[in-house]
Amino acid sequence: VNSTNKLTPSSLREAFGHFPTGVVAIAAEVDGVRQGLAASTFVPVSLEPPLVSFCVQNTSTTWPKLTGVPMLGISVLGEAHDAAVRTLAAKTGDRFAGLETVSNDAGAVFIKGTSVWLESAIEQLVPAGDHTIVVLRVNQVKVDPNVAPIVFHRSVLRRLGV
């Protein structure tokens, strides 16, 4: 470590950004309209029962729309979705512009061409500072091993080196 920064939200954001993560889309149909958000805080939690989690900012205006649906679709984004990540993370506009999606009977929305689809239901919400940890129970999974991942590192989307 070369230097010590004063502990501030921006210094923490910079420090946390040094940890590379994947990016997922969390989406569902709400009253016939696709709603969704991007998250780089996705984490597998448990195999038995099958649980995953992600964190969402308490100030999110999209998350309250998703909390009442029976099922959420989680799509693990790949290299082809670098532009989509910014669109999904936008504060305004159509977050699904230019994206092909599929909805299932439970209302979960998935993005085509991603490496993993997880149909999930909210299991638990855990308050954690300025975020909420969302624990989801996985009901169905679909995997495409041929889709290369995208990595979010230091606020830049990168491809995984081979």
Question: Where in this protein do the model-derived segments appear?
Answer:
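Basic, polyanion-binding surface patches
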Residues: V1-V162
